[in-house]
Structure formats: structure tokens, C-alpha cells
Amino acid sequence: MFTKRDLLQQRTSIDQLKRHNSLSPQSAEMLGQSIASSWQRSASCAIPKERLAAPLLAQHNKAKTTLDLALEACSNDLSHIAAQSSMVIAVGDVGSTIIWTASSTQMQSAAEKVHFIAGGQWAEEEVGTNALALSLKTQQSSCVFSNEHYMESVHDWVCYAAPVIDPYSKQVLGVVDLSTTWKNHNTLGVLAAERCASIIQTALIEQQRQRLYIRAFA
């Protein structure tokens, strides 16, 4: 666990790194190469400084994907995790658009304010550095702490994300993100995101098993 002093010191260090126009190799190593690279990509995207929420895309009726169907099967489990952990859980598609969320009462208002809801477009080119987009970019688990985020309105957040991998094709189908306030930062956050990704992947396996069963007796 981190103390409040540890976390405040981490925020101060990040602010100091942000003041430099270019990151030295030592600074990039301190920050983490994936975050440093994301900052550089974000800076080149001409994201409006006044942007405080992700663009919100209209949710049109469309055919359900395998990820949508898997979420229907495991949404109760994920919602329970969100409620018990004082977090908001979001699942995004491969384009960084959120397709499903469940939120604790503690995070609901904050999530709605920044459009961390279904339809929110969290691609780096829209909102800059964030864990959801970073995990899709690197195809690895990620953590973005407080002011490591590009958009100032989520500097009070810490976010953990993990890609959702198709257990059969091994392709990335989407991403799951767990977010809470920076004061609740925990070293187990990334493991929790990976656990949620595993829950979705188990639902994908069961979904495929049911399809094969139906096909066998059709």
C-alpha cells in the first residue's frame, strides 16, 4: 500500500517531468517508457486544452459482437466488483469506445462528468494518455496514475486496464478498465483489471462451447 505522502510525492515528480518540453532518457525511464511515449503522441494530437470530457458517440443499434454477448453473461460479476471496490469498470472496443460500464456510487457522478460511460470515445487522439487506450496500444496491462493522464479533468483518477484477448484466435477484442480516485491507488490494481479481463474471457469460452453444442445437435 502507498501512503498519502508517497502518492503526493509521485504527483509532484510527474508535474516536474511535465514541465520539460522533451523527456531525457532518464526521465522517460523514471516515468515508464509506455507513458512517456503516450505523452509524446498526445502532444502531437492538438487536443483542445479546454477539453474536460471525452467525445460522446451516438449509440446506434448494431449487431451484437462476441464481446457484447460475453458481457451479457458476466455483467453481474463485474458490477459486483465495481460496487465492492469503490471503482468504475468500463469495457471498451478495439477503437477505444466504451461499450459497457458499471459504477460504484462513489465514482458514478465523476464518471458521468467526463463521459467515462457507454459511448465515450477514449482514444489517445481524442483525450490523450489514459489506461484504456494505452492497453489497446501496447496490448499489455497498464496503469495511469493521476496527472500522468493528459486530460486535466481526470487528474484525480488512477486507472488500471488490461486487454481482453479472444481465447481462441488470440486477437484483442477490447479492453477492461478499472478506475478510482488517486488516493486509493493500490499495487494490486493492475491484477484486478487482469482478473476482470479473465472473467470476460471465461464468458467467451462458455459462449463458444454453447455454440458448438447447438451446432452439434442442430
Give the positions of each predicted feature.
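Short loop/turn segments at beta-alpha junctions that line or gate ligand-sensing/allosteric surfaces
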Residues: 124-129, 135-150
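Cytosolic beta-strand hydrophobic patch enriched in CBS
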Residues: 90-91, 163-165
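Short glycine/serine/proline-enriched coil/turn segments at secondary-structure junctions
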Residues: 151-154, 168-169
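Intrinsically disordered, low-complexity terminal regulatory regions
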Residues: 1-123, 134, 143, 173-218
